[in-house]
């Protein structure tokens, strides 16, 4: 089951939180969901250059607060906050409501699954070989402290006539372990041959009562090369 479902949805309420946080009535729920979708699409499009990892939307009474987690927050804020004010005005025009925006920085961008997936997708659009793009992202994540990473690409790879799926994995990615801190990201590459889907899973450690505890026993053993595996399917 852990291999099939979204790893974030599987761990909601355990070690992951919702990205839309509000309690609506049955009457307002559809409009709130549609509004959240519009906000996310707008911010993803307008702030693509800043490396947006996550967008959290919170509602309380008539207040709406949006938290943008990005790799380059300085580009969003701009000089003296000019750029962030433009984004606020754009959101206000879109949803006809006052919005407060908070900006947070991603601590380790190379170990963020969403940013890694978008990185691979961008390289594929620039016609970089898919294997090279995947391995480059995997090496960067492991150097940033990730315990394991799995990258999967699907579509007409290298312009092949028949679409297929290929994936690489290094280290451990325990998808069935609910206490495992698994970060998941998805992106699409718009190539001349069609759309290529990119999925990334990154294992950051196990979440216990005192936070994330990394595997000390494994680190104490003699150093050995991380496990590598690859699979292609037509």
From Swiss-Prot:
Native organism taxonomy: Bacteria, Pseudomonadati, Campylobacterota, Epsilonproteobacteria, Campylobacterales
Subunit structure: Part of the 30S ribosomal subunit. Forms a tight complex with proteins S10 and S14.
CDD domains xref list: KH-II_30S_S3 (cd02412)
Residues of the KH type-2 domain: 39-107
Family stated for the protein in its record: Belongs to the universal ribosomal protein uS3 family.
SUPFAM superfamilies in the record: Prokaryotic type KH domain (KH-domain type II), Ribosomal protein S3 C-terminal domain
GO molecular function: mRNA binding; rRNA binding; structural constituent of ribosome
Organism: Helicobacter pylori (strain P12)
Name of the protein this chain belongs to: Small ribosomal subunit protein uS3
Single biological process term from Gene Ontology: translation
One term under GO cellular component: cytosolic small ribosomal subunit
Task of the protein: Binds the lower part of the 30S subunit head. Binds mRNA in the 70S ribosome, positioning it for translation.
Keywords attached to this entry: Ribonucleoprotein, Ribosomal protein, RNA-binding, rRNA-binding
Gene name for this UniProt entry: rpsC
Keyword Cell division tagged: no
């Amino acid at each position: 089951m852990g291999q099939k479902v979204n790893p974030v949805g599987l761990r909601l309420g355990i070690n992951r939180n919702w990205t839309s946080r509000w309690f609506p009535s049955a009457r307002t729920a559809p409009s709130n969901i549609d509004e959240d979708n519009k906000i996310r699409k707008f911010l993803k499009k307008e702030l693509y250059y800043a490396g947006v990892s996550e967008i959290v939307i919170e509602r309380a009474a008539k207040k709406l607060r949006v938290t943008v987690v990005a790799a380059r927050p300085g580009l969003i804020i701009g000089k003296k906050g000019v750029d962030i004010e433009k984004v606020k005005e754009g959101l206000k025009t879109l949803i006809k409501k006052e919005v407060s925006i908070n900006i947070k920085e991603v601590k380790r961008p190379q170990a963020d699954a969403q940013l890694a997936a978008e990185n691979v997708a961008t390289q594929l659009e620039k016609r970089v070989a898919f294997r090279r793009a995947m391995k480059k992202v995997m090496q960067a994540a492991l150097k940033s402290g990730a315990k394991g990473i799995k990258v999967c690409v699907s579509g007409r790879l290298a312009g092949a006539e028949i679409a297929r799926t290929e994936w690489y994995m290094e280290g451990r990615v325990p998808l069935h372990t609910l206490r495992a801190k698994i970060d998941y990201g998805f992106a699409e590459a718009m190539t001349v041959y069609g759309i290529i889907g990119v999925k990334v899973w990154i294992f950051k450690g196990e979440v216990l009562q005192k936070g994330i505890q990394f595997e000390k026993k494994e680190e104490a053993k003699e150093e050995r090369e991380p496990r590598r595996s690859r699979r292609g399917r037509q």
